[in-house]
Each structure stands twice: as C-alpha cells, then as structure tokens.
C-alpha cells in the first residue's frame, strides 16, 4: 500500500517532537474505514480494507512514515501546564490530498509516549467511535473539523474506572496538529527562536500569503483570530458544545479538534454543560465565545516578542487584534443567524429579531435544531412552531416581524442551512452501546444520516427526534480519546 508521505513537520522542526513507535497490539481488526475520505487523500480504499488493520494499529506502518509524538503545553481549565504533548497519539506522517492540501495522519490510542504522564496511552472503543461519528457529523454540517480515516479494534482489554473495556485506535486526519499550546510550550521556556520557527512553519503551511505581509507574525495572529472566530460562531449556530476548550485543544488551522466530552445541545439553555469534568461550567455553551477570546489572548502572549522588539509596542499591537475578536465573532454569528432565519439581505433590526426568538426558545427550553428547522414550515403556517415554542401571542408578533424580512424561496433556503439530523446524545449512546455488543449497524445508520444532515429521508424519522424527557438533564460526557 503506497502512501506518498512528505513529512515537513519532522523534517523542518527537529526538537519539536520525540520520535516514537506505536505499542504492539495483539489482534488488530479494522472496524470501519472512511472510504470517502480515503479517496480524498488519494488512497486505495479497497487495499486499505485488506491492509488497514496492520497500518492503522501501527503494527506495520507504510514506507515513508515517520511516527512522532508532538510537544505542546496548554491552559487546562484556566491553569497552565507547561508540558503536555501527545500522551497517547503519534503523528505518522503527512500526505497531500487530491485538492493539493497537506494533511496530517495521526494514530490516537497507540500507546505510551514520553508525554504520557503516567497514563497508559490507550483508547477504548466507545470514545474512538464517538470521535469518528461526531467528526463526520461536523463535516456534514460544513464546519471545519478533523476527521477519522479509520477505527481499529486492538484485541486487548483496557482498564478504566468502569472496568475492562475493548481497546481501539483512531486514525485522525487534520490540516495539522499545531495548537495554541504548541507555541506556549516554547514560549514558557523563553525559547523564542523556536517560537519564531514554528510561526514561520505555520504561516507557510496554513497562511502562505502572509509571508509577504509587512508584519507577518501580527498578520498570522490576526488570521488565527479570524479563523477561530468563524469556527466558534459555526459551533454556536448548530448548538455544538466542545466541552474542553483548553488552549491545547485549539488548532491554529481553524479546525475543530479533540472531540472529548463534546455534545450537541437540545433544549436551548446558554448554561448547558455536559462534560463530567467541567464542574464550574467554564466551557458551557454560552461561554464559548468568551473562551475563544481568552485562548487567543494566551496565543498573543506566546507570540508577543515576535510582534515588536519593544514590549510596550508589542502589547499594543496584540491588544489591537484581540480587541476585534468580539466583533469578528458577532459578525460571523449574525451572518449565520440571518441565513438560519431565511432573511433577505441585512438590516439593523436583525439582531433584535434573532435575540427575541432566542429568548422565547430559552423560556420554553425549545429544541435548538427542530425550532430552526420548523421555521421553513412557519413561513406560511402559524402553527408550525407551537409544538416547540409556548406563548402564542408573543410568537404571533414575532412571526409577523420575521415574515416581513423573508426573501424569495425562504422555506427552501431555511432547510438548506438548518439540519434535520444532528448527533443527538441518546442516539450516539445507542450506537456506541450496540457497537460494544458487536453490532455496528446503528453506528452506520447514524453516520449515513449525519453525512447529509439537511436532507430529510423516509425511514430516519426517529433520528430527528429529541431525547426522551429528562435524558439530557442527567447526561454526562467524558474525555475518552
């Protein structure tokens, strides 16, 4: 099996990683191959079906692979950890896809590395399939994301608090795995030469036009801020909660990365938290835009000496960029909300129109996804929103204001941007429970729906329905991969 590796990170950034090998596993078995993604990468899916168990378990890596564990630091729940790094993952190499984009291939759950900090470096079946599924859901929604190329069962039990669980390894594809925390690792050691080298590499890889900018490092900071503001706005528009927005989980590329305790909100409440470790609600749904700015401030601190030799001027330049983050986010969010509402053009009252609907939704704990989807029917039917929203008098007033702002073919345009299918928590859990019992049918069915979430299909009605009453109130997610 031929992989056309061109491993620029290993070649150009020696000292930013540790060469390492995957731990041996007893009986690797390919559970699922993302054939569509394999095609995008220029790989032979049929051959991968035959050889993938050995390749994607790390047992027999292709020629040209260069397995390594990347170094990074990070703020975790606000506290700084100067050394984190890939504790259970190995970057095995980089390939160029059919569109000419450089993509990382990484094994997650491949065993201990020098960054494991006492952990076993393994992953279990449930979290691996969960990341596979949610990544594909985000891709289907058009949100920048890492994706899973393959899931492999290792054939070995992995000891966790709940007992022995089946081991698994995920092959993750990403634009890169450069994180805010990668810069922090070297900045914390006052190694500004390596911070500069990393910035040069990141610019060349992700934002090559900026190399000619008058102040390329400041332009890079602004580009990352813009990409992340766009990303978080997209999360908010679909009700996605990342769950662990630590700086080591923020990618410079602007992709969603590290699907640990993530989940989709159903009943609208800005305070929604599902993560079992987010006891204070730091990463609640409604806090995500604020954490976006907080994390970008930490990136600015790491890059500060690159902005100007004078510390005062450097801080002024960083703060000038940081001061725009809220406006960047709000502009992207409002643009997306106009699309969700089917509005024609842009008018000054659009923000209040959106906020009034959200207030009604919050009061009723209305299902985020179904409410916006049903707006398509509400274009002509007053009763369309009543199953999800209370207060018909208030609703009628809002409907009148909203309808005056609608453009042509509003119902079609609303359906085109508001999904009917999301990775609802109870359906994800059902699919994972079935997989643990040896049945991947529900997983495949859910993936099939989520790959085209805007098209309603007969036979999938159950996947569009909210969880049973009370399910999400007690639902908790965990960091598994």
UniProtKB/Swiss-Prot annotation:
The cofactors required by this protein are: Mg(2+); Mn(2+)
Q: Which residues form the active site?
A: 248
Q: Which transformation does this protein catalyse, written as a reaction? A: L-seryl-[protein] + ATP = 3-O-(5'-adenylyl)-L-seryl-[protein] + diphosphate; L-threonyl-[protein] + ATP = 3-O-(5'-adenylyl)-L-threonyl-[protein] + diphosphate; L-tyrosyl-[protein] + ATP = O-(5'-adenylyl)-L-tyrosyl-[protein] + diphosphate; L-histidyl-[protein] + UTP = N(tele)-(5'-uridylyl)-L-histidyl-[protein] + diphosphate
Q: Which residues bind ATP?
A: 85, 87-88, 108, 120-121, 172, 179, 258
Please indicate if the UniProt record lists Phosphoprotein as a keyword. no
What keywords tag this UniProt record? ATP-binding, Magnesium, Manganese, Metal-binding, Nucleotide-binding, Nucleotidyltransferase, Transferase
Q: Does the keyword Magnesium apply?
A: yes
GO MF terms listed in the record are: AMPylase activity; ATP binding; magnesium ion binding
Highest taxon of source: Bacteria
Check the record and name the InterPro entries matching this protein: SelO (IPR003846)
Q: Which residues bind Mg(2+)?
A: 249, 258
E.C. designation(s): 2.7.7.-, 2.7.7.108
User: Top-level EC class, please?
Assistant: transferase
The function of this protein is: Nucleotidyltransferase involved in the post-translational modification of proteins. It can catalyze the addition of adenosine monophosphate (AMP) or uridine monophosphate (UMP) to a protein, resulting in modifications known as AMPylation and UMPylation.
Of which family is this protein a member?
Answer: Belongs to the SELO family.
Name assigned to this protein: Protein nucleotidyltransferase YdiU
Instruction: Write the gene name.
Output: ydiU
């Amino acid at each position: 099996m031929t992989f056309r590796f061109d491993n620029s990170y290993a070649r150009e950034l020696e000292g930013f990683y540790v060469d390492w090998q995957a731990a041996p596993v007893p009986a690797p078995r390919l559970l699922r191959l993302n054939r569509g993604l394999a095609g995008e990468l220029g790989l032979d899916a049929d051959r991968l079906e035959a050889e993938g168990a050995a390749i994607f378990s790390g047992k027999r890596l292709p020629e040209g692979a260069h397995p390594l564990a990347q170094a990074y630091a990070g703020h975790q729940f606000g506290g700084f950890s100067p050394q984190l790094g890939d504790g259970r993952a190995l970057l095995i190499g980089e390939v160029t896809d059919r569109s000419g984009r450089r993509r990382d291939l990484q094994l997650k759950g491949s065993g201990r590395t020098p960054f494991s900090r006492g952990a076993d470096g393994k992953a279990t079946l449930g979290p691996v399939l969960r990341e596979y599924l949610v990544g594909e859901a985000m891709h289907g929604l058009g949100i920048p994301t890492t994706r899973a190329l393959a899931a492999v069962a290792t054939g070995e039990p992995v000891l966790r608090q709940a007992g022995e669980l089946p081991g698994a390894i995920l092959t993750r594809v990403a634009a890169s795995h450069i994180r805010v925390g990668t810069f922090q690792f070297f900045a914390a050691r006052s190694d500004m030469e390596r911070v500069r080298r990393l910035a040069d590499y990141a610019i060349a890889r992700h934002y090559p036009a900026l190399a000619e900018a008058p102040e390329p490092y400041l332009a890079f900071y602004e580009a990352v801020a813009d990409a992340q503001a766009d990303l978080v706005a997209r999360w908010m528009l679909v009700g996605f909660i990342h769950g662990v927005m630590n700086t080591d989980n923020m990618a410079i590329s602007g992709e969603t990365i590290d699907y640990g305790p993530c989940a989709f909100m159903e009943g609208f409440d800005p305070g929604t938290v599902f993560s079992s470790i987010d006891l204070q609600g730091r990463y609640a749904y409604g806090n995500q835009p604020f954490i976006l700015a907080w994390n970008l401030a930490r990136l600015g601190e790491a890059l500060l000496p690159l902005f100007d030799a004078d510390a005062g001027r450097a801080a002024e330049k960083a703060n000038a960029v940081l001061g725009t983050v809220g406006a960047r986010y709000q502009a992207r969010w409002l643009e997306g909300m106009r699309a969700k509402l089917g509005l024609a053009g842009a008018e000054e009252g659009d923000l209040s129109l959106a906020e009034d609907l959200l207030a009604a939704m919050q009061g009723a704990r209305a299902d985020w996804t179904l409410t916006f989807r049903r707006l398509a029917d509400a274009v002509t039917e007053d009763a369309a929103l009543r199953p999800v929203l209370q207060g018909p008098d208030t609703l009628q007033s809002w409907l009148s204001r909203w309808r005056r702002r609608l453009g042509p073919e509003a119902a079609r345009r609303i359906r085109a941007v508001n999904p009917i299918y999301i990775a609802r928590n109870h359906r994800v859990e059902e699919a994972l429970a079935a997989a643990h019992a040896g049945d991947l049918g529900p997983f495949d069915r859910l993936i099939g729906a989520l790959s085209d979430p805007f098209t309603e299909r007969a036979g999938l009605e159950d996947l569009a329905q909210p969880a049973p009453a009370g399910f999400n109130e007690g639902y908790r997610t965990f960091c598994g991969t």
